[in-house]
Structure formats: C-alpha cells, structure tokens
Swiss-Prot record:
Function text: Regulates mitochondrial small subunit maturation by controlling 15S rRNA 5'-end processing. Localizes to the 5' precursor of the 15S rRNA in a position that is subsequently occupied by mS47 in the mature yeast mtSSU. Uses structure and sequence-specific RNA recognition, binding to a single-stranded region of the precursor and specifically recognizing bases -6 to -1. The exchange of Ccm1 for mS47 is coupled to the irreversible removal of precursor rRNA that is accompanied by conformational changes of the mitoribosomal proteins uS5m and mS26.
Subcellular location: Mitochondrion
Protein name (record): Mitochondrial 15S rRNA processing factor CCM1
Primary location recorded for the protein, binned into one broad class: mitochondrion
Skewed-composition ranges (Polar residues): 41-55
Superkingdom: Eukaryota
Stated family: Belongs to the CCM1 family.
Transit peptide, start-end: 1-18
Note, other: Involved in mitochondrial-nuclear incompatibility, a major determinant in reproductive isolation between species, through hybrid incompatibility of Ccm1 and its interacting partner 15S rRNA between yeast species.
Length: 775
C-alpha cells in the first residue's frame, strides 16, 4: 500500500486539534496510507473497532492492548498480596500485644518481698495473741495454737526468704554472697536506686568476705557500678583485710576505674591513683598492665595533664605495650577540650586515620577533631572531615551537626549553610538536645533575628531548661537585633522554604504576645524600636536578678552593657554600668615611686567617675527604658573585668565623648593593679592588654584623633602582634582625611609585623635567593 509524508502544523484549541497555516505550533511529519488519503474526513476510531485485516499496525496495537491488560492484572495482584501481608503483620502485632498484656498481668500478681514480709509479720502477731489468750483461757474466735502452728508451717513452706527476698534483682550477685545478704538485697530495688553502703554493712554483719573464694569476691566487686564503688572503697578495704584477701592488681584496677569515672578528676584523686599504680608496679615487676595504662590515660585527660599522658605513653612504648584506639580517642578529647592544643589533636587524629587497621577512628574521634577545627576558625577543614565521614560510611551524630552549624555561622561564605546542618538533625529523626536548642539561639541571635530568639527562649522557659549560655545568647540578640528601619540581607533562616516555615511556626506558637505571660516579654512577637529593646532587656535583667541570680556573672553583665552601647544612649550606658558593675578595690598599695599629678579638668555631667556611685540617685523615674525594680536591687553587681572597659571604650567612640574615654582608660590602669588581674597568667594578661589596645586605636580613630591612635600603635609595636585586621580602620581613616604620614607609618608597622611574626621574606632577601639559584 502506498504511503507518503505530509507536513502540517497543529495548534490545539479547547479539546479539538486543527491545522493552521500560521507560524505557531510545532511542525510534525505524519505518514498516512492511501486509504486515509482518499477519505480525509474519516474520524479516528478506537483500537477495538479497527477493521479486521492483515495490517501490521493494527496487530501491534492489539498486542499492546493485551500487554497493558496483563500488566494491570499483575499490578492488582501485587497490590492484593501487599494488603494480605500488611494484614498478617497487623494480626501478628496484635497477638504479640495481647500476649504481652497477659504476661504483664501475671507479673503484677507476683508478690513483692515487702508483701511477703507483711504476711509473715501478721502471722507472728497472731501467734502472740493466741498464746496470751490461751494462758488466760479466754475463748475467742482466734484459731487454736495447733491451727496457728500449722498455718505458720504452711506460710514458711510457701515463702522461702533466700529465694524471694529479691525477686527481680537489679544486679546479678554471686549466690554465696546473696545468701549472706538475705533481706539486704531489697536495698537494690532498681538500677537507679541502689544503696551499696547498707549492703556492705549487712554483709559485714554476716562474716563479710570470710571463707569466700577470691574469684567470688572479685566477681561481686565487678557488679558494683564504678560511680558507687568509689564511695565504698574504705568499706571494701576493711572487708578484704578482715578476710585476709590480698588486694591484687585486678582489684586495684577496679579502684582506679571507679575513681576515674567522673567528668573531672582533681589533683587529689590523681595522687591516689598514682599510689595505686605504684602498688601495681610492685605486683607486676615494674610494669603496668595495658588496662591500667588506658584508664590512667583517661584520668590524666580529665585532669588536663598532657605532660603526664606523654610520660605514660613513653612508659608504654618502653614496655612494648600497644596503645589502643580507645586510649587515643581519650587523648584526642583531652587535647581538644582540656589542653586546647589543636596542633597535637591534628597529629593524633592523623595517626588514627592513616593506621585504620589498628586505630580506626570512630564517631567520637571525628566529632572531637571537627570541634577542634571549628574552635580554631577552620570551617573548611571541618567540612572536609565531615565529607570524609560520609565517604567512610561513619555515622555522624547531633554534636557534629551543631559544631558545623556554629562554624558556618562565623564565616561569610558559609553562613547560609548553618541552618542546613541544624535541619539535618530533624531529617535524621534525632531528638534535639539542650545544646542544640542553645546553638539555635546562637544562630538566630548572631543573625540579628530577635523575634526567633525570643520565641526559642520562651520554649526553654516552658521546659524550665534555661541556662547561662542561653541567657547570654538572648542578650546578644538584643544588641544585634535588626529593626524595621535597618536595611540589609534577609535572615539566614529565610533562605529556603523549610526555614521560613520553621521560623513562622516557632514564633506563632511561642505565646509571647499573651499578656498573661509571666516572663517580662513585651506582648509583641517582634520588637520594632530601640526603646522597646532597651525596656525589655532592662526588665529581663531585673527578673534575672530577682529570680535567677546564678545567671548574673561578668560575661552576662558585659552583654547587658553592650545592649546599651548598641541601642541606647551614653546616659543609658553609664546608668547600666554603675548599676550592674563595680571596681574591685583590692589594689596593691605598693605603687611606683613616681606619682604624676593630673591637673584638674572640667568634665561633663556624663562622667560617671566624678559622680557618686549610686544607682539609686541616678535612677530616672520617668524613663521608659529602665525597669522600676532596678531601683531597689543595688546589690546585684559584678566586678568589672577587662572586657567591661573594652565595651565602655566602644560606647565612648560611638557617642563621641572623649572625656568618658579618657576616664575609662585611666580606671583600666587601676584595674591592672588589682589582685584579680595580677593572678592571671602572663599569656592571658597580654591577650587582654592587646584587646584593650586594639579598642583604644579604634576609639581614637572614631574621635578623629589619628595622631593619638598612631602614638598608641607605635608604643606597642614590639609588644603585640599587630595585623591588618586591627590596623585597617586607622589606615582607611588616614587615607580619607589625606593624612599620608599616618597612613605610611601604619603600613610600615604592618610590614614589619609580617616580617617578624608571619615569616614574610624581605625584598632584598628574595633577590639574593634568586641570584643564588640562577632563576
């Protein structure tokens, strides 16, 4: 049959298809037969109504229809089988629940030891009453003595004290000791309520460890939890001494493990552990067992003593004792959390990673090294380690996600990934812990999202889980809050749809706008003015002083002052500084022999040092940004620290008040002479001085005193490691004002610092290097 090609254009209008000679619609090539060409108006009929002839296309269509019919039948069959399997599984589950309920009902009918004891006591009372009545020959309805005796024998046959005194034991105790304990086992009612002191007292009353095999005694000691064993070590020693059982290395190892089981091990406990180790060395011919070494590594780690860990590792190497992966993990945790030695932590982790056959790092090791990288502001490497975990198919945990979120928030390039890691916790169906909620507060407060921070904090209030960390993050949110008139990027959490929904739901369900809320939140979901921020932060501070004074310390006070520096006025800042801090007057009276007399200067009324330090007299009755309660709580004040003066200098620069700045750095000089500052390590003193000097340079620059800022810089050039991070503000201001002398001097100081501290090569040294190499 002849076939030919015909090209037409189609456009669809409604449900009909028509050809068009216009320019719209795709070009399609349709092959039609001569039969179709002769009858162009013939409508397409269903496949079932096709003419029955030997056309191949018709056969293929019928075959396709049959295949589709068979496919639907198979699909329905599979669907039916799936339903049958679900019904079977449901039936099985129901039967298991019924069976479990029957077993629980049987267990509920089992008498507990106290019930049996009550029955026994009631029988004894009946015996006493019967005997007395028998002597008096008074006839009553009480059974005869013979009947009572028979009843007693029956009760004793049904109730055997040794078998039923502790029906469901919390700890499987050796049988020989269980017989001696008797009713004392009832003090071990559950895993969470154990009184081993009374158990040992009862055991001592019944021969103690006498005539018991050594293995039985050791087995009994291993059943005592480590946290409980450290409390009863003196009693155990006495029982061992009375039974003349020597304290072997195995028993001493139990002592060591129990004393090292706490979250921190003080120096006094370390001394006791080292004495135990000396006794073990005598028993083992000068060599510590591997188990003892591993426990001591853990103990030194909790004590933060890296040097003793290194000595112990050298001893293990000398005696050819191979260190285990668990010991390396403990050392890694010590370097990260106690010693904060990032370089050593990286070396240990690399050792574990490149010797996977022996020290394969697990989830805990990856968690510790990721936290170390985040703490050292290397989020790129932390993300690389996380990707390595995924490649090695090592299961991450919630702490890793929180650490990565915290690290991403501190970097401009990664800040949009911070909430993604938080939402990963929800994808893995993990229950958020308190640190997770706290760092959600941190992310929102750092981003200036005050509404979300207040909503999350209200959730912690409902759960009664407010901590010092979460309180500080709330205060941080007030100082960084974005107001309605602040222009900038949208909140990070609004970067995707999931974040927007999460933020809306948390704020909507917080209940902050409820006027009956007991916490002093203003009844608005969002604060829109600086006055609202100042008023609410003041009310929250007063509430903490009255009801939760443990939240008040130097760190939270500094955050409280920073709110006034960012959102208030200079008078607000001075009022808060006077009302919440004081200068510790414990100053060393032995000063230098030279006394410089300052000339009398006229200062403004805002100078808080020339006025009487009294929050009551400074209180403004008409102020709407101060809580009235603060008028009567003058005692809730903390000593000023170095960071207090840094924040005060920042406020002086922002409000352009030189006199206030001058008095601040004079008082900071007095603060350096206090006992609190003198007791600090040298490195900490240098760190705080550099922090204050950096703020001095910034404040003087904001006051347009560029020469004074340069003088501070030149006087401390060789004392501190200045970088462009601290010097860029002064250099930029000098360039804007056209002060080339200051700009050039700042560049010279930065260049010399790079040569001295950063290892930058000099130009002439580079030329000499090229001449010697010849290229």
């Amino acid at each position: 049959m002849l076939r030919y090609a015909r090209t037409v254009r189609f456009s669809q209008v409604g449900n009909s298809v028509r050809t068009s000679s216009g320019s719209f619609g795709p070009i399609r090539t349709i092959f039609i037969s001569s039969h179709d060409r002769k009858s162009p108006s013939h409508s397409l009929s269903p496949i079932s109504n096709l003419p029955n002839h030997n056309d191949s296309s018709t056969e293929r269509a019928r075959k396709t229809l049959d295949d589709d019919f068979q496919r639907k039948i198979k699909y329905d069959e599979l669907k039916t089988r799936k339903r049958i399997e679900d019904l079977r599984a449901l039936t099985k589950k129901v039967s298991q629940l019924v069976k479990q309920k029957q077993e629980l009902s049987k267990i509920a009918k089992i008498p507990v030891p106290s019930d049996e004891i009550k029955k026994l006591k009631s029988v004894e009372d009946v015996v006493k009453v019967t005997k007395s009545q028998h002597v008096a020959t008074v006839r009553t309805n009480i059974p005869e003595p013979e009947t009572v005796t028979t009843h007693i024998e029956k009760e004793e046959s049904e109730f055997v004290m040794e078998q039923n005194a502790f029906i469901v034991p919390a700890t499987p105790i050796p049988e020989e000791i269980a017989k001696r304990l008797g009713l004392a086992l009832r003090y071990l009612v559950s895993e969470t309520n154990q009184n081993w002191t009374l158990v040992l007292d009862q055991l001592k009353a019944d021969r103690g460890f006498k005539d018991l095999p050594y293995t039985t005694v050791v087995d009994f000691l291993t059943k005592i939890p480590a946290s409980e064993l450290q409390k009863v070590i003196p009693k155990v020693d006495q029982l061992l001494k009375e039974a003349k059982i020597p304290k072997t290395a195995k028993i001493l190892n139990l002592y060591i493990a129990s004393l090292a089981s706490g979250s921190a091990v003080p120096n006094q406990v370390i001394q006791i552990l080292e004495n135990y180790c000396k006794r073990i060395r005598k028993l083992k011919k000068g060599k510590l067992p591997k188990r003892t070494c591993e426990v001591m590594v853990q103990a030194y780690g909790k004590n933060g003593n890296i040097n003793r860990i290194q000595d112990l590792l050298s001893e293990m190497k000398l005696h050819k004792i191979e260190i285990s992966g668990m010991a390396l993990t403990n050392i890694l945790a010590t370097c990260v959390y106690k010693a904060r030695d990032h370089k050593q932590a990286v070396e240990i982790f690399d050792t574990m990673r490149f010797q996977k056959e022996v020290y394969k790092p697990g989830t805990r090791a990856y968690q510790d090294i990721i936290v170390s990288y985040v703490n050292n502001d290397d989020i790129e490497k932390a993300i690389d380690i996380y990707r390595e975990m995924i490649t090695e198919k090592i299961e991450p945990n919630q702490q890793i996600m929180v650490a990565l979120a915290r690290g991403c928030a501190s970097r401009e390039a990664f800040k949009f990934k911070s909430w993604d890691f938080i939402f990963e916790i929800n994808r893995n169906n993990w229950t958020p812990t308190l640190p997770t909620y706290e760092y959600m507060l941190y992310l929102s407060s750092r981003d200036g999202d005050l509404a979300l921070t207040r909503a999350l904090y209200s959730r912690l209030l409902k759960d009664n889980t407010v901590s010092l960390r979460s309180f500080n993050f709330l205060l941080l949110a007030y100082s960084k809050a974005r107001l309605s008139d602040d222009l900038g990027e949208p909140f990070l959490i609004n970067a995707d749809e999931k974040g927007r929904k999460f933020r809306f739901n948390v704020i909507d369900r917080s209940g902050i706008s409820d006027p009956t809320n007991q916490f002093p939140f203003l009844p608005f979901n969002e604060l829109t003015t600086k006055e609202q921020i100042m008023a609410e932060s003041s009310a929250i501070w007063a509430h903490a002083c009255l009801n939760n004074s443990e939240l008040i310390n130097s760190e939270s006070t500094t955050s409280y002052l920073n709110i006034a520096s960012e959102r208030g006025t200079l008078s607000d800042f001075i009022d808060r500084m006077e009302g919440s801090t004081f200068l510790d007057e414990k100053i060393n009276n032995v000063l230098s022999g030279v006394v410089i007399e300052e000339p009398d200067v006229v200062v403004e009324t805002t100078d808080f040092l020339t006025q009487k330090s009294s929050a009551h007299e400074k209180y403004d009755e008409t102020s709407i940004v101060k809580s009235p309660i603060l008028k009567s709580i003058q005692s809730k004040r903390t000593p000023r620290v170095s960071l207090t003066y840094v924040v005060a200098l920042k406020a002086a620069g922002k409000f352009n008040n030189y006199n206030f700045a001058n008095r601040i750095w004079q008082e900071r000089g007095k603060f350096r002479k206090t006992e609190t500052f003198k007791k600090l390590p040298r490195t900490e003193k240098d760190k705080l001085d550099f922090q204050f000097a950096t703020q001095m340079v910034r404040t003087l620059t904001e006051l347009n005193l560029l020469e004074d800022a340069l003088a501070v810089l030149k006087s401390t050039e060789y004392q501190f490691r200045w970088t462009w991070k601290e010097l860029d503000v002064l250099k930029s201001a000098a360039i804007r004002q056209g002060n080339t002398n200051v700009a050039q001097t700042v560049r010279s100081i930065a260049r010399r610092a790079q040569l001295t501290y950063e290892g930058k090569i000099r130009r002439k040294d580079y030329k000499r290097y090229v001449m010697q190499r010849g290229y």
